[in-house]
């Protein structure tokens, strides 16, 4: 925790104003204490709530904490482990780490390889847990979130987040890619790109 505090106190961090750590990447390992999965930094190692410690450190310096979720790509991320000899089961039960391990989508477009309702319900619960436990001011979603099967759950997540923010009397933002959200309901993100000219809206 000393290292986290000293990093957050550095001039480099202070000049950034926003700190948005990865809360969960495609591998399904949560960098925070969770009641949903045992595969998290608090239980498995380093036995610390990384997001929680970082929140305390950056907010003590007057900075803003956000979190990013890459969970949706876990739908297929582990599947390549089935292609060679590994500890990856061929037909994983619904466990905390390997499930669901579906094959890579063929085109990674908005309709190919769509995640199941069961998986999206799990995604939504994880997102709400992050919102409730850490009150992030920014909620960033990575690529493939534009998947058509995700759209109803994105609406539910946004409604939950914005309603919670109203209860906290805080302004918050959702960052998204492609057409995951209807324009004007969240903040579009252009990764490794730029607009052709100045725009009158946040991006």
Model-flagged regions — what are they?
Residues 57, 61, 66, 76-105, ...:
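Core domains of carbohydrate- and sulfate-ester-processing enzymes
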Residues 16, 135-136:
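Proline-aspartate-enriched helix->loop->beta-strand connector
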